[in-house]
């Protein structure tokens, strides 16, 4: 059996960024063969990734990349907010956004097969993801992305949890302000005419319920419903919203854009974890389960 030295462990860690104890175990199993130990670690880290794959990822980051008229927005998820602040995780997200912009992958699976090496976990982005799962011990996933091309682009990231890309013609400063506005006010459409019919139907149903409870005559109730729907449309359409930086507190986004001779052709808003049902842990139940498992294994 070959002697496993501290320098060998350090060398393997430098190549794989795996935990020190995992490196020592791999070297011991490989009888000091560095190449074999490195391969053993890759397999082991991949196994850890498989075990973590079923765990919910509702935290994470939104990353963007823009180069001229080509850009991308991507959401990358983790299990905890702690991991979303990890430098390697953030680097992976930024790299993924760049790969989307440069290669236009068809879907998440195709994105994962693109070449990219980070922390010695390459050669593909999927290898990097699995390597980080093995290193950190948390599941992580590429949730969604969008690629943009052919238009002027402005991006805004609020921290790392909210990301916006605006497609526009005109003034770049005005477009950047709109991106910031979208992050703050979260409109669902450019104009009231673009608001999805299902959202309008839901709002109308709520308004009708309130009108029915009011006991007002039918004609007045109908006006109440229509008024509520119109108010909702103004609140959720970008053009009709009051611009967040309006000096008078009244100027709408549409008015601001007209003054800046700028047209917004579209926008995309990503909010980390939006629509993902988070797992709520019952700590007492978890402890009880662990105690029961320990007793059964004794």
Curated annotation (Swiss-Prot):
The Swiss-Prot or TrEMBL record annotates one GO molecular function as: translation elongation factor activity
Q: Write out the GO cellular component annotations.
A: cytoplasm
| Superkingdom of origin | Bacteria
The answer on whether this UniProt entry bears the keyword Protein biosynthesis reads yes
Alphabetized Pfam families for the sequence:
EF_TS
Q: Where in the cell is it found?
A: Cytoplasm
Q: Belongs to which family?
A: Belongs to the EF-Ts family.
Q: What does the function comment of this entry state?
A: Associates with the EF-Tu.GDP complex and induces the exchange of GDP to GTP. It remains bound to the aminoacyl-tRNA.EF-Tu.GTP complex up to the GTP hydrolysis stage on the ribosome.
What this protein is called in its record is Elongation factor Ts
Q: What gene name is listed for this protein? A: tsf
């Amino acid at each position: 059996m070959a002697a496993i030295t501290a320098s060998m462990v350090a060398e393997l860690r430098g190549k794989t960024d795996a935990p020190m104890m995992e490196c020592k175990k791999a070297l011991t199993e490989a009888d000091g063969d560095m190449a074999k130990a490195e391969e053993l670690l890759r397999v082991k880290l991949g196994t850890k990734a498989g075990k973590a794959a079923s765990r919910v990822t509702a935290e994470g980051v939104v990353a963007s990349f823009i180069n001229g008229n080509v850009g991308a927005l991507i959401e990358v998820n983790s299990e905890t907010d702690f991991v979303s602040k990890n430098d390697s995780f953030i680097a992976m997200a930024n790299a993924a956004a760049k790969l989307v912009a440069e290669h236009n992958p068809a879907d998440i699976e195709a994105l994962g097969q693109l070449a990219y090496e980070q922390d010695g976990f390459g050669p593909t982005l999927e290898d990097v993801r699995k390597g980080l799962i093995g290193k950190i011990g948390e599941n992580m996933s590429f949730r969604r992305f969008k690629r943009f091309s052919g238009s002027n682009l402005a991006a805004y990231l609020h921290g790392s949890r909210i990301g916006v890309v605006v497609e526009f013609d005109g003034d770049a400063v005005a477009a950047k302000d709109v991106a910031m506005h979208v992050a703050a006010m979260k409109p669902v459409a450019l104009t009231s005419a673009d608001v999805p019919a299902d959202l309008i139907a839901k709002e109308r149903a709520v308004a009708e319920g309130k009108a029915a409870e009011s006991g007002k005559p039918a004609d007045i109730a109908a006006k109440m419903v229509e008024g509520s729907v119109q108010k909702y449309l103004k609140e959720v359409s970008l053009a009709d919203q009051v611009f967040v930086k309006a000096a008078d507190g009244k100027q709408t986004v549409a008015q601001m854009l007209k003054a800046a001779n700028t047209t917004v052709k579209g926008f995309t808003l990503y909010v980390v974890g939006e629509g993902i049902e988070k797992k709520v842990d019952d700590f007492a139940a978890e402890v009880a389960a662990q105690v029961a498992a320990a007793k059964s294994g004794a």
